[in-house]
Design a protein with these regions (language model features):
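N-terminal accessory segments
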Residues: 1-143
Length: 143
């Protein structure tokens, strides 16, 4: 469901974004969107947006720019320094954007920001292609 009007302090005020994509502390989606590989990182954002399209990413970025709040982008949440979180800011969690398009002729792939190494391997394997990647499939990938 997409809603066209939002509270004034919502990431959705910047444009059309589903209210179901904006998550606040205490919700399971907020917890999932702030979970990191490095458990020592203690940054606590104000909200998480889990977009499924470029338009929703743009809306979240416009909101952050208009309000001056910090933004962090979370792919797989595997960064050792915890840069996927911004204290008091907005996390754009790309985990729902996991598309991988393989161009066999050029042996390249277009990889969405929420894709993992396992997603890339699974997409290239049917074509006999092997991407340069580590051994843990849960690590985020984008290129």
């Amino acid at each position: 469901m997409t809603i066209d009007t939002y509270p004034p302090n919502s990431p959705a005020t910047a444009g059309p974004i589903s209210a179901t994509r904006v998550h606040l502390p205490g919700s399971p989606a907020f917890d999932a969107g702030t979970r990191l590989w490095n458990g020592a990182v203690t940054r606590r954002p104000a909200a998480v947006v889990r977009p499924t399209s470029r338009t929703e990413v743009q809306s979240a970025l416009r909101y952050a720019a208009d309000t001056g709040i910090p933004v962090a982008v979370r792919g797989g949440g595997h960064d050792w320094a915890g840069r996927a979180l911004a204290t008091g800011g907005l996390v754009i969690d790309l985990s729902l954007m996991r598309r991988v398009e393989v161009d066999v002729a050029s042996q390249t792939a277009l990889v969405s920001g929420g894709s993992t190494a396992a997603d890339v391997v699974a997409a290239t394997e049917p074509f006999g292609l092997v991407p340069a990647t580590g051994t843990y499939g849960g690590v985020g990938r984008s290129a």
